[in-house]
Regions:
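N-terminal glycine-/serine-/threonine-rich beta1-alpha1-beta2 phosphate-ribose binding loop
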Residues: 1-97
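Short acidic, glycine/serine/threonine-rich loops at helix termini
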Residues: 20-21, 54-56, 113-116, 138-145, ...
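Short glycine-rich anion-binding loops that position phosphate/pyrophosphate groups of nucleotides
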Residues: 82-84, 132, 160
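Rossmann-fold NAD(P)-binding glycine/threonine-rich loop
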Residues: 86-96, 106-144
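A short hydrophobic/small-residue beta-strand
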Residues: 101-102
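Oxidoreductase and adenylate-handling cofactor-binding alpha/beta cores
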Residues: 139-152, 163-178, 205-219
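NAD(P)-dependent dehydrogenases' Rossmann-like dinucleotide-binding region
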Residues: 152-163, 225, 229
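Substrate-binding/catalytic subdomain of NAD(P)-dependent oxidoreductase enzymes
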Residues: 179-234
């Protein structure tokens, strides 16, 4: 009998809760897709006592990182933290403990990609990040799997949904930038602090990751020329 895949999660916010809910509510479907059962073994959060929309048994959730890092039964860890630290440190520890990683943290990979992928290569581990860049396409698997025999000469695309929404509304309706930004925030297209979206940071970090996939080179994301939306009036 094939043994199940046991996964750990670091963080259980909106994305983490969704991951746990899918795995818990659709075990047969997931098992067919993966070829064997996929089980949530342990989830690490800051406050295990916090009320959540999807509750886990008390022995499956804690604030003890070692419960995931040092568990030999866990082979894959979903690192669901934003920002650079402690995400970078935890990622390195997990890779060195023999875990494969899944993350959507584009800022982490764009900033520390060479180091993290270097550790992964050294340990014979992998880092999956489909959700970090245009996951709806999905572009990461398209480049790394479907187009491996193709020579890519350039990459063009819309990589930031917030900017796309704002520019489209400004062009079609002739609306003012600040007016459309407020609309985007009220409708959930923009964060309360939209800085990284409207100044080009989000798009350049994604482009840095795509550049690595397509051309095998790490380009510092901050060195990529970018022009934000703040100075556009109409």
């Amino acid at each position: 009998m094939t043994s199940p895949i046991r996964i750990g999660l670091i963080g259980m916010g909106t994305v983490g809760t969704g991951v746990v809910r899918v795995l818990k509510n659709s075990p047969e479907h997931i098992s067919r897709q993966a070829g064997r059962a996929v089980l949530v073994d342990h989830v690490v959060v800051q406050d295990p006592s916090k009320k959540r929309s999807f509750e886990l048994p008390s022995d499956q959730i804690s604030n003890d990182f070692a419960q995931v890092r040092d568990n030999p039964d866990i082979s894959i860890v979903a690192l669901l933290l934003g920002g650079l630290e402690p995400a970078r440190t935890l990622a390195i520890e997990l890779l060195k403990s023999g875990k494969d990683l899944v993350t959507a943290n584009k800022a982490l990979l764009a900033e520390h990609g060479p180091e993290l992928f270097g550790v992964a290569h050294e340990m014979g581990r992998s880092i999956a990040f489909e959700a970090a860049v245009a996951g709806g396409i999905p572009i990461v698997s398209a480049i790394s799997e479907c187009l491996t025999g193709n020579r890519i000469s350039s990459i063009r695309g819309i990589l930031n949904g917030t900017s796309n929404f704002i520019l489209t509304k400004m062009e079609q309706d002739g609306s003012d930038y600040h007016e459309v930004l407020s609309l985007a925030q009220s409708e959930g297209y923009a964060e309360a602090d939209p800085t990284m979206d409207v100044d080009g940071t989000d798009a350049t970090q994604k482009l840095a990751l795509l550049t690595h996939l397509a051309f095998g080179q790490w380009v510092p994301w901050a060195s990529i020329p970018r022009f934000g939306l703040e100075s556009i009036d109409q």
